[in-house]
Curated annotation (Swiss-Prot):
It comes from Clostridium acetobutylicum (strain ATCC 824 / DSM 792 / JCM 1419 / IAM 19013 / LMG 5710 / NBRC 13948 / NRRL B-527 / VKM B-1787 / 2291 / W). GO terms for biological process: DNA recombination; DNA replication; double-strand break repair. This is Nuclease SbcCD subunit C. The keyword Hydrolase applies. PANTHER family: ABC TRANSPORTER ABCH.3. Heterodimer of SbcC and SbcD. The keyword Plastid does not apply. GO terms for molecular function: ATP binding; ATP hydrolysis activity; endonuclease activity; exonuclease activity.
Length: 1163
């Protein structure tokens, strides 16, 4: 990575924007950054890390200048690989108004290689990741590679023992293979040991699980399933019998319900006939009603029209009188408009001209008045401005004096940076002292805590062991009891076989009783049905006679009625359609009574319905007799099929024997279940106790191991604590102070006062600039005011001249100067009055003529409508008489009496239709139900017996099914546990293998042997590279090697390649050797990156070197730079500054003037 350009604003001591051009700075390969202590030299390096990684290398969070609320950095750099790429990173930070902390506002990285700029990433986190991806180094690696900090050159060369190993671990980033890996490994081993203990506890829970137990349970399950299948068949048979009985019982109840409904319907017949007649008359009346309504409506409209015609004729007379009066008024108004109006219009025009002139005059007077006021105001304002200018000059002198006093105060408050650094070092040591003390105390407390935990675990382990032995003893006792119980238990098949015999005997006795009862009931039904059938047939014969007589009467009356209708329709001269005669005699014939005919028809309809009902009853009785006869035959056959064997054995003695066996089996099952539950409960408790025991055993071992480790750490902590305490006392003696914090507080107070003073100077300078600007503005305004005053006075004279001219002109036109608007309004009022009078009369005349014309048209229209209505009245009467005759109403009143609306008619018809439908449905339902019943019959006692038998069979099947489910669950659980046991054994084997590997690793990484091995190999490569550089710098005089223990050995080629210890080197020799080693180390760290770093900074304290040694160092530095590597030196020494071909001078911040500034100098 090659830097191109850096811009800084608001970072540490840099307040205003400063730009550093690295292309010019690195042109000669060697350059220096110079400036006094605290000027901001290192801040330039911070700006690069802040741009690339979003933070400074010194890990400070308060890096924004105190006088700024925003911070901007941008860094342009180049990557020189196969293809040269250029990038620009820009970041902006803001200060939080509430907390005062610095927060990132924006960040972006762009590719500026070509003509088109491409934004690669935006946002702080994304930009951080992109920069690390491009360069290939983290922040820590970058700072170790680019900068060699002060005081670190010779440290790496001379360190030995633990400090050397720790430094190597940090430099090569091997922490993850040292303590971190050891801690991870210890945690992993502890975790796996815990898993092993838990696994051992879990395996204890599978002691009674094996293939023999599984086989035994499967045999029991098979035996129980066979019993269950037999019981299921018996239950299915009982279920079929129950379903058939349920159907028959339901059908019997439904037939009884339908017969009751049919009887209720027959009682409502007369009421329904009356409703049917009312509906028929209502429909006829509804047909006549529209004609009646039309006729009555026509009469009403005729009366209304007559009244309207009379009203309009009276209105016509009044309008005629009003028209004559308005014609006279219109004539007078027209005369005024044509003669007087033109004169008034001329006068109005002259007055308007005068008013315009008067308005111009008034405006000019107002302008004059405004100018007079403005002249007075300008005079006063000019005087005030001159006074302000004098006051402003006094303020400027006062502010200048205050700034000079504050600058003197700031100089007195400055504290040397070296002193401040040593105080900071003391505070850091004090903080470290507190941390070491806390760590030491914590280790002591942890050691005590683990000792208590160890004692607790040991005590609990012993208690759990005793408890476990007790539980195992109980488990053995219960297991023996269960084995003894299984030996004495009778087999299940004995009870089941006896139960089958008992059930068979019960069923036969029940069926025998049922068949006898059904046989008796069927015989009774046949006898009753035959008696009813005889009665019904006698009633049917009588009903047939009645129907025959009524039919004869109806035929006679209908014949007479037809002859009467024919006679009525015949006209004189027309041929009779029956006899052909043209002479018709109508007198002497008696009119047929239609009401009597309707009564006979209604009576016949009733007889017909009754006959139909009686027929249905006879058919049902005959069907019932046939069904019962078949049932009697079937019952006799069923009784014979039962046989005589079941009567030989007493049902009561069989039931007693069965109950005894059943009680014995139930007692055994209860005891066995209780023992199984006790054994299961004890096994689970034993397993839990075993797991707890193993857990406490592990805790005891871990606590014991941890106590040993903590004691070792405590000894190390005490040693480190004593070292820090000694260092603090030495530093206090050197600085001759007792309290670092109090001294730092004093320094910070001085800094705070200095910052406040600087802020005050800044405010005063700003105010001084404002006062200078105000003075210039006031002088400029005062000059402009005087010019405007002169201009306004000349304008005032011109206004006086124009006013006099306008007054003379108005008097010539009108004669007066005042009251012009009143005169104008008076003339306008007269003109308006004449015009309004004429317009009003003309408008009223038009309105009267419109009213007269409309009234005349309405009278003509009403007469025409009256004539049409009279014609319609005659037509409506004819139609009404015709429909009354067709619907057989004597007059309008009769039709109105029988009128019903559609809703009432529909309601009556609906009731009739509903009745007929219900009767038809009931008859049909009875017929369908009889067919479904198929002559079957069921008594209530028999139905109850069927239900009880079904419940008993179901209960037996359910009990056997539940036992099967329980046994299946046990088999399934044993199978699952066998699989789990297999997995646990496999896991145990894998865990033992893993623990073996972890133990080997623990031995390998013990005492950081692996870290030393890796670091030593890295160090050998670095020493080879460092030896080459050292030979180049020293002209082949010295070389560098590493022995088997990782210690650096110097080869002195001036003395035949003799080996020398690093401690024997002089100051200059140590410096050049350390420099060569540091450069090689930097290259090694760079190998991790994806881009070569072409810049190297030495932030080294050269002040301790004498002139000869400094010459050697500078010669060395001039040799190591090249085209691909630029070397920068950060220093404040003038001797080094004179040797540098390119120099970047950093000027420190000045209170009240601005922040640090940079300047490039080239020799």
């Amino acid at each position: 990575m090659k830097p191109i350009r850096v811009r800084i604003k608001g970072l540490n001591s840099f307040e205003n924007e400063q730009e550093i051009n690295f292309e010019k700075l690195t042109k000669r390969g060697l350059f220096g950054i110079f400036g006094p202590t605290g000027s901001g030299k290192t801040t330039i390096l911070d700006s690069i890390t802040l741009s690339l990684y979003g933070e400074v290398a010194r890990k400070s969070s308060n890096f924004m200048n105190t006088n700024c609320n925003s911070l901007n950095v941008s860094f342009e750099f180049q990557i020189s690989g196969k293809e040269i790429k250029r990038y620009l990173v820009e970041r902006e930070f803001r200060r939080d108004n509430k907390t005062g902390s610095v927060r990132s506002k924006s960040a972006k990285i762009v590719d500026i290689t070509g003509d088109e700029v491409e934004v690669l990433e935006e946002g702080a986190k994304s930009v951080n990741e992109k920069c690390q991806e491009i360069i290939g180094l983290s922040l820590d690696d970058f700072t170790r590679t680019v900068v060699l900090p002060q005081g670190k050159f010779s440290e790496f060369l001379k360190l030995e023992g633990k400090e050397r190993r720790n430094m190597l671990e940090r430099l090569f980033n091997l922490q993850e293979y040292g303590d971190e890996l050891s801690f991870k490994l210890a945690r992993k081993i502890r975790k796996e040991r815990e898993k092993e203990n838990v696994l051992v506890g879990e395996l204890k829970g599978y002691e009674n699980i094996n293939e023999d137990v599984l086989k035994e349970r499967r045999e029991l399950l098979k035996e129980n399933n066979d019993f269950f299948n037999e019981a299921s068949k018996e239950y299915l048979k009982a279920e079929e019998e129950y379903n058939e009985g349920k159907e028959v019982w339901g059908l019997q109840i439904e037939i009884e319900e339908k017969n009751r409904v049919r009887k209720d319907l027959m009682e409502k017949k007369d009421e329904i006939d009356l409703k049917e007649k009312r509906a028929r008359l209502g429909e006829s009346s509804s047909k006549v009603k529209p004609y009646i309504d039309n006729y009555e409506n026509t009469l009403k409209q005729i009366d209304i029209l007559k009244e309207q015609i009379l009203s309009r004729e009276n209105t016509m007379k009044a309008i005629s009188l009003e028209k004559e009066d308005m014609e006279k008024k219109l004539s007078i108004a027209k005369d005024n408009k044509e003669k007087a109006l033109p004169k008034f219009m001329i006068k109005h025009h002259i007055i308007l001209d005068a008013i315009k002139e008067k308005d111009l005059l008034d405006n000019i007077k107002l302008e004059k008045k405004r100018l007079q006021g403005k002249i007075e105001k300008l005079s006063l304002e000019a005087s005030n401005k001159e006074e302000l200018i004098k006051q402003n000059i006094k303020d400027i002198d006062s502010l200048t004096l205050k700034i000079q006093n504050l600058e003197s105060k700031i100089d007195n408050l400055k504290v040397p940076e070296e002193y401040k650094n040593k105080i900071n070092e003391g505070i850091f040591l004090l903080r470290n002292y507190d941390e070491k003390l806390k760590h030491k105390n914590k280790l002591g407390l942890d050691c005590d805590k683990f000792q208590v935990d160890f004692e607790k675990a040991k005590s609990k382990k012993e208690m759990l062991f005793n408890k476990l032995e007790e539980e195992r003893s109980k488990l053995d006792t219960y297991t023996k009891k269960l084995q003894d119980l299984n030996k004495d238990f009778p087999k299940d098949d004995v009870l089941l076989t006896f139960q089958e015999k008992l059930n068979d005997s019960r069923q036969k006795w029940a069926k025998y009783s049922e068949y006898n009862e059904s046989l008796k009931a069927s015989l009774r039904v046949v006898e009753n049905s035959e008696q009813v059938l005889r009665t019904k047939k006698e009633e049917m014969t009588k009903l047939e006679d009645k129907i025959s007589k009524v039919n004869i009467k109806i035929e006679s009356l209908e014949t007479e009625n037809m002859a009467h209708v024919l006679r009525e329709k015949l006209k004189s001269g027309e041929a009779c359609p029956v006899c052909g005669s043209v002479h018709h005699i109508k007198e002497g014939f008696k009119e047929v009574d239609l009401k009597a005919l309707e009564t006979l028809k209604s009576e016949l309809e009733g007889f017909e319905k009754k006959r139909k009902f009686e027929n249905e009853e006879i058919v049902m009785c005959e069907a019932s007799i046939k069904v019962e006869e078949k049932n009697i035959k079937k019952l006799n056959e069923s009784i014979n099929n039962l046989g005589e064997e079941f009567k030989e054995v007493s049902l009561e003695s069989m039931e007693k024997k069965f109950n005894y066996l059943k009680e014995k089996v139930n007692k055994f099952n209860l005891e066995k279940i209780q023992l199984d539950d006790n054994i299961k409960d004890l096994s689970e408790r034993s397993n839990k106790i075993e797991v707890e025991y193993q857990k406490e055993k592990t805790v005891e071992k871990q606590c014991e191991k941890r106590i040993v480790d903590l004691k070792s750490e405590l000894e190390e902590a005490i040693k480190e604590f004593n070292e820090v305490a000694y260092t603090i006392e030495n530093l206090k003696a050197e600085l001759k102070i007792q309290d670092f914090k109090f001294e730092m507080k004093e320094i910070l107070e001085k800094e705070r006062v200095r910052v406040e003073a600087e802020g005050e100077i800044k405010d005063l300078r700003n105010l001084l600039n404002i006062r200078h600007t105000e003075k210039e503005q006031l002088m400029d305004k005062c000059s402009r005011l005087k010019e405007e005053l002169s201009k306004n006075k000349a304008e005032l004279k011109e206004k006086d001249k124009i006013i006099n001219e306008k007054i003379e002109l108005i008097k010539n036109k009108v004669g007066v100067l005042d009251n012009l608007y009143e005169l104008k309004e008076k003339i306008e009022g007269t003109i308006k009055k004449i015009e309004e009078q004429y317009n009003l009369c003309d408008k009223k005349m038009n309105e009267i003529e419109d009213k007269y014309r409309k009234c005349s048209d309405e009278i003509i229209k009403y007469h025409s409508n009256l004539s049409s209505l009279k014609d319609r009245k005659v037509n409506d009467i004819d139609k009404l008489n015709k429909i009354l005759m067709e619907e057989k109403f004597e007059n309008i009143e009769k039709a109105k009496e029988n009128y019903l609306n559609d809703k009432e008619i529909n309601l009556l018809k609906s009731d009739v239709e509903k009745y007929k439908n219900e009767l038809s449905k009931v008859n049909g339902a009875v017929e369908v139900l009889s067919k479904k019943l198929k002559n079957r019959k069921l008594t209530e006692e028999k139905w109850i017996e069927i239900q009880n038998n079904r419940v008993e069979k179901a209960s037996k099947a359910k009990a056997l099914q539940e036992r099967s489910i329980k046994l299946e669950e046990e088999v399934k659980n044993i199978e699952i546990k066998l699989k789990e046991l297999g997995k646990l054994l496999k896991t145990k084997q894998e865990l033992e293998h893993k623990l073996s590997l972890l133990d080997d690793l623990e031995k390998l990484f013990k005492g950081k042997k692996f870290v030393e091995f890796v670091a030593l190999n890295q160090l050998k490569y670095i020493s080879i590279e460092a030896s080459k550089r050292l030979k180049e710098i020293t002209g082949g005089n010295y070389g560098l090697e590493v022995d088997d223990n990782g210690k650096f050995i110097i080869r002195d080629y001036k003395n035949g390649g003799a080996k020398r210890d690093a401690s024997t080197l002089s100051g200059g020799e140590t410096f050049v050797t350390s420099l060569a080693l540091a450069l090689s180390l930097s290259n090694q760290i760079q190998l991790r990156g994806s881009a070569p770093l072409e810049l190297f900074f030495l932030d080294e304290g050269f002040g301790t070197l004498d002139s000869n040694l400094l010459e050697v160092v500078m010669d060395s530095l001039e040799k190591i730079h090249s085209e691909r590597l630029s070397v920068g030196i950060i220093s404040h020494l003038e001797v080094i500054k004179e040797r540098m071909p390119v120099r970047l001078i950093v000027s420190p911040a000045e209170a009240g003037v601005g922040g640090s500034k940079v300047k490039l100098e080239i020799s």
